Amino acid sequence: DMFDYTDESDGTKRLFDLIPIFYENGRESLILIDEIDRSLHTNLTRKFLELFFEIVEDRECQLVATTHDSNLLDLELLRQDEIWFVERQVDHSSKVFSLNKFKERFDKKIDKEYLLGRYGAIPIFDDDFVLEDAYEE
């Protein structure tokens, strides 16, 4: 029996969205993916990136992706200059900065340090935070 696409999980559908990237034939290309980890297990997202980097190794291809998956902040997967943070400012603008700015050792656990707030770009809640307050802005 053929499967019905509408019966598939969000993760399976997401994979169908991402797979064509591997068949990009252009020698020079820029690929943008918002929320690369959406509906995917962190290990699957990591494997996707590893395969992508292997396939495009001899091409002039650049991937720009956003994620909320801090497990991808790994210097065995990405170079320091490939990891960028976005931090919301008080005036609601965004500040973008590279991990390179922090001059970290290559053996450092970036994901743990990030979650501890070392690099900024994490949500900060005060003791009086109430969800309804977010809707009043």
Give the predicted meaning of each segment.
Residues 43-50:
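Conserved D-loop/post-Walker B switch-helix segment of ABC ATPase nucleotide-binding domains
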Residues 24-25, 55:
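Histidine kinase transmitter module recognition
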Residues 50-137:
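C-terminal lobe/lid and adjacent interdomain/linker elements of RecA-like ASCE P-loop ATPase modules
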Residues 1-23, 30, 36-40:
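Conserved ABC ATPase signature
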Residues 39-41, 72-73:
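Catalytic P-loop NTPase motifs of RecA-like helicase/translocase cores
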Residues 33-34, 67:
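Active-site flanking residues adjacent to catalytic metal/cofactor-binding acidic residues
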Residues 28-30, 62:
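Residue-level preference for the first positions of well-ordered beta-strands
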